[in-house]
Amino acid sequence: MISIQQAEPHHRDGWERLWRQNIVNFGAPDMPDDVIDGLWQRILDPDHAMQAWLAIDGTNDDHTVVGLAHLIIHPHTFSLRNVAYLEDFWVSPDHRGGGIGGLMMTALQKQAKQNRAARKDGFPPARE
C-alpha cells in the first residue's frame, strides 16, 4: 500500500536516495553534500516555505520511499493568498506505471487547497 506523507527526519535516507536519482537525471550529479544537507534542513524547518512530500511503500517492513515532490508555498504580488509551486517531482523508475504519480498529485493538490493557494504553478494538467 502506498501512502503520501510529509517528510519527517526518519525519511532522510529514502528521500536522499531518490533526490540523487532526480539530480542525476536532470544534469546536476555533482551537487555538493552541504547543499543536499541544507535542502533537507529547509524541508524539516516548519517556518520555511519548502515542503517535501513522499510516497511511501508500506508493503515491506522498511517502508521504502518511492516518490518525492518538493512543494513551495509562498506569497505573490497579485493576491493576498499564496501560490503553491511544484519544484520537483520524481517517482522511482522501478515503481512507475502503478499510479503513484497520480496519488502524489492528488495529495499535493489537497495541500495547495489547505494552504489557500490562489494559484498552482508547476503543476501539470490533469490526465484522463
Name each region found by the language model.
Residues I2, Q6-R81, E87, Q111:
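Acetyl-CoA-dependent GNAT
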Residues Q5, R96-G97:
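Short, cationic motifs built from Arg/Lys/His that form the positively charged side of catalytic pockets
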Residues D33, A126-R127:
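Conserved beta-strand edge residues that scaffold enzyme active sites
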Residues I72, S92, F123:
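Conserved residues at the C-terminal ends of beta-strands
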Residues H74-H76, D94, R127:
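Short coil/turn motifs at secondary-structure junctions
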Residues F89-R96:
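A short, internal acetyl-CoA/4′-phosphopantetheine-binding micro-motif in the GNAT/acyltransferase core
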Residues G97-K110:
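Conserved acetyl-CoA-binding loop-helix of GNAT-fold acetyltransferases
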Residues A112-P125:
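Conserved GNAT acetyl-CoA-binding A-motif
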